[in-house]
């Protein structure tokens, strides 16, 4: 019998190769899961340079196909039913019942009857009552059209004691009903296992998350959920916001369970949370992923931080701030299983150490990056020390880019994002809506412009609920809940309607009204520029000095005046004013056809009447205007505009009440008469008053101002129009007022009210009925304010129709809301909240850039006052004076002029001219087309851009034919005799020239002959 040979042992070399191969595979796996930490530090330098206005504004684009649109809620915030059907107590039940979570300023809620009710209970005992309203909640999801719904399971509802054992069947049934309803609607669930509501029994028995044993109990609870619900769930979140759980639950004690331990305890709890998460991830990965095919992650919250100055030190401090909040949990999971180096270097013994086996356990335990970004952590619960003296910022786009670079381009699912409004705000939540728009826009830019892999977005939250440490003092829901009602009906807010439309459009698709229009204006269109006040420099040139001087060439090298000897005085000429020619040169360089400026009443008539006329100033204006005409530039002259000091009035009038005094109107008519007589020969377009409708002007002053305008208009119409053939009107400031919530009828009414008070106040008497707007009168009577004067019938006849065209200045658009959200920006008089869309571009002085507002206000004026000839007599913005390229002004001018073109071409507005503001920085710092320094003017890039628009007479495209416009020249009336006799004058000049040459030759040769004879 042959003996069996013993099995051959693999040679030592083979074993070594297998070991090396195994190590290589582990290294490759680690490399796939990790990136070199610290790459995110590049983010600040990348975004340090201010973006071009086109990139900083709204991006008209859509999200990728298959993008996940979600909305979320949390069990304790919304479920209520805290004692129903066997639910156990959670740490939040205990925390709110014993210490109270809401701040002392919890609002007094007004019942429907109008009587004040007691403050809301500062607990989540009932909250939004979602436990008893599954159908109601899911109908809200159906209205929104979301693809995913994030909710959390209450650990204490399915396991009242927190430990594995007999589960609470009613609790399981509730979540099954919810999941089944979601399946019927085609909405995918995103389920959070732990959203801060630990069973109280586990806190009492083990000390909560401070005990490592809780990780195993959490694993058992997760296994129960995976087994019962996992077949219907593709996205799982293990723990929500571990930073808040650890730091504010066990270190500061601000949140449940309210343990005011040391920072060491906070770091220990975070350590245990990471281990608990990792165990659950491995449980799912091993036992449930093969059959259920889901994905598991942990929801990490973060702020964003900007350096105080762009120095290496400050950038390192910003990186450290993110390490201490987000990197605390993200680096162990997404990089190498260990804490950030900055934490280990700064915290020394406070930070627990991971064993090598724990590092392997934790590393790579996320199938996607679940990000939470919003007010709860980012701007309310962030520990001030973790800012490291840098500046917080609500910039989601930059945070997404940082995560992308720091953690090796993970797929990012934004699982919580939104803002909040006051607890008293009901359904018109404009502030929340615009923050939602901002965050979604930044997400879209991160995807389309930065290449970040964002797979989904979750608006927070579905409905109003209990807001943790803020109680019911704020609201974060897309649906309004009346907490005092029995049925707790969900009513969609403006934010819900906005989000529903955005999901339907899958983003912000390009719309026809957002596209630039190609086309041209009519040939006689007035292209102008504005200089509110030309610099009146009456310094005469050296040639007007009648004195005689000797040049002391041997000693002082100076001119010495010869006493008693004077030259004959000559008549002054316009060339004597050295300040005029440079301004004309600038205007000719711009190639504008019109120039608008205001006269200085106080300079011309220092005493306010014609007893003292400053003829030098008047002569300067006469020269300025006549030189404009000779340069083929049409002057547009305003008689008055409010300005400091004394509102632009002569001191004598200002000290006697200014426009409050009815005699000022008569003085204005007298002043206008002088200007018409002295300057009207060269002026075809007059403005009586430029932008008089300021909000700080009283109704009495406005009444007298209207009368003054009408007197001046009739004076011109009766005495000067026939000879001078000019036109005259008033120029009103007309910024557009837009309803903050486009879905709100209340906001539409408020916007119309503000338009009537801002524009209609002075426009309606002139261009409309001859009386003040009915809206104004009714509103003031309702407020028991009877200060608005009444016109007599004679005054109505005087004021009504006192115009030849409608002139408006337009700079920006303002949003108005009827809900009182920010007391600092609330107008109690008109009961209106002013605000802005935070996605709009803003100038350095915070003026919003909203081009479509110009088109809207022109259409509103046409609707109110008919098809009148209109001029935009001022439109412009300030820009960074230190920037070499005034790119914001270029963007502003291009888009506002294009909206004016749309009004002319598409809306058939009778638009006759457009005036850009302003000529130079000399009179309008930061707003000019020319920089001014040391008596030198330097054109900015925006000037050349505006000139190009003027040269094209609009916007020429590849398919746009330019309109042929023959060049016109201003007729010089004094030159009429010469213009009609050009040929005769040339012939006479030739004869005179020939005669002079002949005399010269005769004289020359006669002299020569005499010399020869001698």
Curated annotation (Swiss-Prot):
Endpoints of the signal sequence: 1-34
GO BP annotations, alphabetical order: calcium ion homeostasis; carbohydrate metabolic process; determination of adult lifespan; energy reserve metabolic process; negative regulation of systemic arterial blood pressure; norepinephrine biosynthetic process; positive regulation of bone mineralization; positive regulation of MAPKKK cascade by fibroblast growth factor receptor signaling pathway
GO cellular component, one term: extracellular region
Span list, region Glycosyl hydrolase-1 1: 59-508
Source organism superkingdom: Eukaryota
UniProt-listed InterPro entries: Glyco_hydro_1, Glyco_hydro_1_N_CS, Glycoside_hydrolase_SF
Keyword annotations: Cell membrane, Glycoprotein, Glycosidase, Hydrolase, Membrane, Repeat, Secreted, Signal, Transmembrane, Transmembrane helix
All ranges on the Extracellular side of the membrane: 35-982
Tissue: Membrane-bound protein is present in distal renal tubules, inner ear, ependymal cells of brain choroid plexus, elongating spermatids and mature oocytes (at protein level). Soluble peptide is present in serum (100 pM) and cerebrospinal fluid. Expressed strongly in kidney, moderately in brain choroid plexus, and at low levels in pituitary, placenta, skeletal muscle, urinary bladder, aorta, pancreas, testis, ovary, colon, thyroid gland and adipocytes.
Listed transmembrane segments: 983-1003
Knockout or disruption consequences: Mice display a syndrome resembling to human aging, with short lifespan, infertility, atherosclerosis, skin atrophy, osteoporosis and emphysema. They have various metabolic abnormalities, including increased insulin sensitivity and decreased insulin production. Mice overexpressing Kl have increased resistance to insulin and IGF1, a lifespan extended of more than 20%, and generate fewer offspring.
GO MF annotation list: beta-glucuronidase activity; fibroblast growth factor binding; fibroblast growth factor receptor binding
Induction data: Induced by 1,25-dihydroxyvitamin D(3) in kidney. Down-regulated by angiotensin II and up-regulated by statins through modulation of the RhoA pathway in epithelial cells (in vitro). Isoform 1 (but not isoform 2) is up-regulated by thyroid hormone in adipocytes.
Protein name: Klotho
Organism: Mus musculus
């Amino acid at each position: 019998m042959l003996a069996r040979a013993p099995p051959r042992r693999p040679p030592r070399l083979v074993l070594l190769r297998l070991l090396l191969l195994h190590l290589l595979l582990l290294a490759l796996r680690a490399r796939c899961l990790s990136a070199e930490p610290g790459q995110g530090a590049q983010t600040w330098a990348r975004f340090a340079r201010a973006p071009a206005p086109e990139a900083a504004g709204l991006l008209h684009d859509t999200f990728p196909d298959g993008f996940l649109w979600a909305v979320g809620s949390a069990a304790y915030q919304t479920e209520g039913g805290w004692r129903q059907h066997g639910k156990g107590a959670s740490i939040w039940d205990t925390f709110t019942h014993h210490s109270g979570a809401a701040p002392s300023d919890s609002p007094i809620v007004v019942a429907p009857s109008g009587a004040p009710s007691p403050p809301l209970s500062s607990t989540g005992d009932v909250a939004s009552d979602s436990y008893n309203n599954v159908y109601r909640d899911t109908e809200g999801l159906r209205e929104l059209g979301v693809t995913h719904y994030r909710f959390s399971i209450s650990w204490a509802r399915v396991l009242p004691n927190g430990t594995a054992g007999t589960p609470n069947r009613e609790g399981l049934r509730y979540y099954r009903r919810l999941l089944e309803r979601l399946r019927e609607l085609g909405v995918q669930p995103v389920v959070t296992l732990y959203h801060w509501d630990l069973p109280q029994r586990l806190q009492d028995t083990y000390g909560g998350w401070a005990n490592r044993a809780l990780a195993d109990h959490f694993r058992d609870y997760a296994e129960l959920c995976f087994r019962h619900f996992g077949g219907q769930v593709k996205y799982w979140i293990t723990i929500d916001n571990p930073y808040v759980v650890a730091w504010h639950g066990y270190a500061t004690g601000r949140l449940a369970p309210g343990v005011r331990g040391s920072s060491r305890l906070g770091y220990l709890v975070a350590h245990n949370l990471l281990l608990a998460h990792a165990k659950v991830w491995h449980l799912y990965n091993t036992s449930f992923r093969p059959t259920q095919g889901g994905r598991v992650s942990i929801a990490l919250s973060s702020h964003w931080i900007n350096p105080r100055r762009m120095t290496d030190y400050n950038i390192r401090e910003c990186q450290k701030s993110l390490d201490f909040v987000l990197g605390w949990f993200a680096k162990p999971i997404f990089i190498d299983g260990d804490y950030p180096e900055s934490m280990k270097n700064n915290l020394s013994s406070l930070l627990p150490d991971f064993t090598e086996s724990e590092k392997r356990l934790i590393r790579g335990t996320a199938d996607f990056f679940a990000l939470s970004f919003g007010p709860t952590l980012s701007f309310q619960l962030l520990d001030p020390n973790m800012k490291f003296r840098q500046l917080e910022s609500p910039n989601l786009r930059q945070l997404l880019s940082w995560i992308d670079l720091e953690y090796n381009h993970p797929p990012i699912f934004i699982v919580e994002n939104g803002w909040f409004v006051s607890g008293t705000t009901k359904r018109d939540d404009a502030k929340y809506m615009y923050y939602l728009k901002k965050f979604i826009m930044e997400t879209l830019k991160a995807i389309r412009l930065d290449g970040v892999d964002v797979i989904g977005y979750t608006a927070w939250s579905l409905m109003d609920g209990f807001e943790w440490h803020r109680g019911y003092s704020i609201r974060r829901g897309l649906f309004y809940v009346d907490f005092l009602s029995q049925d707790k009906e969900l009513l969609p807010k403006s934010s819900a309607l906005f989000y529903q439309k955005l999901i339907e459009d899958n983003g912000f698709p390009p719309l026809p009204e957002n596209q630039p229009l190609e086309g041209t204006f009519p040939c006689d269109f007035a292209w102008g520029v504005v200089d509110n006040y030309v610099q009146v420099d009456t310094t005469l040139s050296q040639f007007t000095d009648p004195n005689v001087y000797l040049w002391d060439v041997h000693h002082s090298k100076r001119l010495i005046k010869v006493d008693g000897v004077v030259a004959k005085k000559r008549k002054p000429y316009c060339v004597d004013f050295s300040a005029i020619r440079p301004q004309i040169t600038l205007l000719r360089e711009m190639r504008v056809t019109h120039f608008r400026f205001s006269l200085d009443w106080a300079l011309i008539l220092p005493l306010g009447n014609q007893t003292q006329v400053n003829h030098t100033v008047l002569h300067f204006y006469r020269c300025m205007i006549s030189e404009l005409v000779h340069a083929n530039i049409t002057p547009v002259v305003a008689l008055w505009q409010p300005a400091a000091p004394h509102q632009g009035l002569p001191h004598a009038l200002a000290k006697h009440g200014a426009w409050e005094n009815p005699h000022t109107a008569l003085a204005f008519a007298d002043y206008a008469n002088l200007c018409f007589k002295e300057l009207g020969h060269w002026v075809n377009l007059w403005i009586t008053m430029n932008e008089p409708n300021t909000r700080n002007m009283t109704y009495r002053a406005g009444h007298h101002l209207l009368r003054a305008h009408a007197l001046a208009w009739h004076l011109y119409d009766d005495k000067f129009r026939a000879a001078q053939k000019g036109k005259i009107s008033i120029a009103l400031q007309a910024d557009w007022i837009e309803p903050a919530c486009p879905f709100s009828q209340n906001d539409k009414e408020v916007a119309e009210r503000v338009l009537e008070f801002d524009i209609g106040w002075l426009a309606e008497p002139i261009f409309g009925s001859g009386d003040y707007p009915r809206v104004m009168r009714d509103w003031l009577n309702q407020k028991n304010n009877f200060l608005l004067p009444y016109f007599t019938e004679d005054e109505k006849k005087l004021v009504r129709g006192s115009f030849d065209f409608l002139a408006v200045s337009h700079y920006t658009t303002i949003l108005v809301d009827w809900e009182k959200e920010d007391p600092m920006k609330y107008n109690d008089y008109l009961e209106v909240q002013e605000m802005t869309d935070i996605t709009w571009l803003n100038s350095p002085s915070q003026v919003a850039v909203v081009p479509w507002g110009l088109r809207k206000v022109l259409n509103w004026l046409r609707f109110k006052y008919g098809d009148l000839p209109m001029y935009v007599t001022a439109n412009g913005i300030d820009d960074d004076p230190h920037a070499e390229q005034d790119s914001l002004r270029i963007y502003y001018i291009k888009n506002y002029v294009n909206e004016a073109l749309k009004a002319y071409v598409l809306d058939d507005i009778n638009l006759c001219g457009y005036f850009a503001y302003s000529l130079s920085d000399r009179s309008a710092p930061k707003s000019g087309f020319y920089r001014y320094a040391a008596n030198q003017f330097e054109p900015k890039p925006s000037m050349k851009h505006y000139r190009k628009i003027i040269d094209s007479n609009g916007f020429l495209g590849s398919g746009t034919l330019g309109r042929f416009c023959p060049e016109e020249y201003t007729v010089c009336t004094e030159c009429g005799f010469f213009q009609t006799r050009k040929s005769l004058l040339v012939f006479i000049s030739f004869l005179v020239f020939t005669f002079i040459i002949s005399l010269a030759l005769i004289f020359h040769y006669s002299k020569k002959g005499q010399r020869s004879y001698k």
